[in-house]
């Protein structure tokens, strides 16, 4: 499927892109080459090939989900300018 100039103008309008007349031929050629590559990829027979999320069988070594820091909320709120019921009070910024 090849794009025409009017197709690229419509796509540019929908995408809110301001293309001038000098850019349209270059953009049209670039989009047509991208669509040509997509056509090549779609032509490949992939029956029997399992989809991959990653080309290698890799797994992440995750650390155990353990609490490593103590709760210091009281110490942090002691130095805060204003708190109430465990919450930080800040000036109103939106009316």
Swiss-Prot record:
GO terms for biological process: glutaminyl-tRNAGln biosynthesis via transamidation; regulation of translational fidelity; translation. GO terms for molecular function: asparaginyl-tRNA synthase (glutamine-hydrolyzing) activity; ATP binding; glutaminyl-tRNA synthase (glutamine-hydrolyzing) activity. Pfam families: GatC (PF02686). It is an enzyme of class 6 (ligase). The keyword Acyltransferase does not apply. It catalyses: L-glutamyl-tRNA(Gln) + L-glutamine + ATP + H2O = L-glutaminyl-tRNA(Gln) + L-glutamate + ADP + phosphate + H(+); L-aspartyl-tRNA(Asn) + L-glutamine + ATP + H2O = L-asparaginyl-tRNA(Asn) + L-glutamate + ADP + phosphate + 2 H(+). The keyword Transferase does not apply. Allows the formation of correctly charged Asn-tRNA(Asn) or Gln-tRNA(Gln) through the transamidation of misacylated Asp-tRNA(Asn) or Glu-tRNA(Gln) in organisms which lack either or both of asparaginyl-tRNA or glutaminyl-tRNA synthetases. The reaction takes place in the presence of glutamine and ATP through an activated phospho-Asp-tRNA(Asn) or phospho-Glu-tRNA(Gln). This is Aspartyl/glutamyl-tRNA(Asn/Gln) amidotransferase subunit C.
């Amino acid at each position: 499927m090849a794009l025409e100039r009017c197709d690229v103008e419509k796509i540019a309008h929908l995408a809110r892109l301001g293309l001038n007349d000098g850019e349209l031929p270059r953009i049209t050629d670039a989009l047509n080459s991208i669509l040509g590559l997509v056509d090549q990829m779609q032509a490949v027979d992939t029956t029997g090939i399992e989809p991959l999320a990653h080309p290698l069988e890799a797994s992440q070594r995750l650390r155990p989900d353990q609490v490593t820091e103590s709760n210091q909320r009281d110490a942090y709120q002691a130095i805060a300018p204003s708190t109430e019921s465990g919450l930080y009070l800040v000036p109103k910024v939106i009316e």
